[in-house]
C-alpha cells in the first residue's frame, strides 16, 4: 500500500504560514474551538516529517516536544544521525520514502515551505488540510513557494472551528 502524505497546516487568509521572521504569534489572535481537530488528525498519523528550520522553531516554542510518541523525521543538510526526539534525514526524498518501514501508512508533513515544495515537486503530497486563519499578514513565508508544479485538487470537506475554516483537499 502506498504511503499517504498529508499536509496539515494553518495559513493566513492571504496565504502565509509565518511572518518574515518565522513568528507565528498571529495564530493565537483568532478564536477556534478546542484544538480545532488537531488531536483527532494526529492520532491517525504514523510518522511526522519536517524541515530543520521547522524543527528548530518547534523546540523554541515548547519545552515538551509535541511529537514524542510518533516516529519523527527531520530533513537537514547539516544535522546527521538522531537526537532524543528525531532522526535526521540527509538522503533524497525518494530514497527516504522507499526506506520507510512498511507499517508507516500515513505521514504528516508538518512543514515548512521548503520541504513542502520538495514533496510537491516530487508529486508526493496526497492530501491537504489547511486551516485558514482570518488574518491578513501582508507578507511573510508563503505556504506555497514559486516554482511548484501545477496540481488539480478535489475539495472533499470543509469544517468550521469558530472563526477558522478548515479546508480538505485531495489529489
Functional labels for PLM-detected ranges:
Residues 1-171:
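Enzymes that bind and transform nitrogen-containing heteroaromatic metabolites
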Amino acid at each position: 500500500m502506498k504511503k499517504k502524505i498529508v499536509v496539515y497546516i494553518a495559513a493566513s487568509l492571504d496565504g502565509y504560514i509565518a511572518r518574515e521572521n518565522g513568528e507565528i504569534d498571529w495564530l493565537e489572535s483568532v478564536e477556534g474551538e478546542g484544538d480545532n481537530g488537531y488531536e483527532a488528525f494526529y492520532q491517525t498519523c504514523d510518522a511526522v516529517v519536517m524541515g530543520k528550520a521547522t524543527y528548530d522553531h518547534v523546540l523554541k516554542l515548547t519545552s515538551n516536544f509535541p511529537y514524542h510518541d510518533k516516529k519523527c523525521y527531520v530533513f537537514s543538510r547539516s544535522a546527521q544521525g538522531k537526537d532524543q526526539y528525531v532522526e535526521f534525514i540527509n538522503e533524497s526524498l525518494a530514497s527516504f520514502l522507499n526506506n520507510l518501514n512498511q507499517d508507516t501508512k500515513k505521514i504528516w508533513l508538518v512543514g515548512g515551505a521548503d520541504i513542502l515544495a520538495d514533496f510537491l515537486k516530487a508529486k508526493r503530497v496526497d492530501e491537504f488540510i489547511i486551516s485558514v486563519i482570518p488574518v491578513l499578514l501582508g507578507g511573510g513565508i508563503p505556504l506555497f513557494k514559486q516554482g511548484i508544479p501545477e496540481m488539480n485538487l478535489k475539495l472533499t470537506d470543509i469544517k468550521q472551528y469558530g472563526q477558522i475554516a478548515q479546508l480538505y483537499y485531495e489529489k
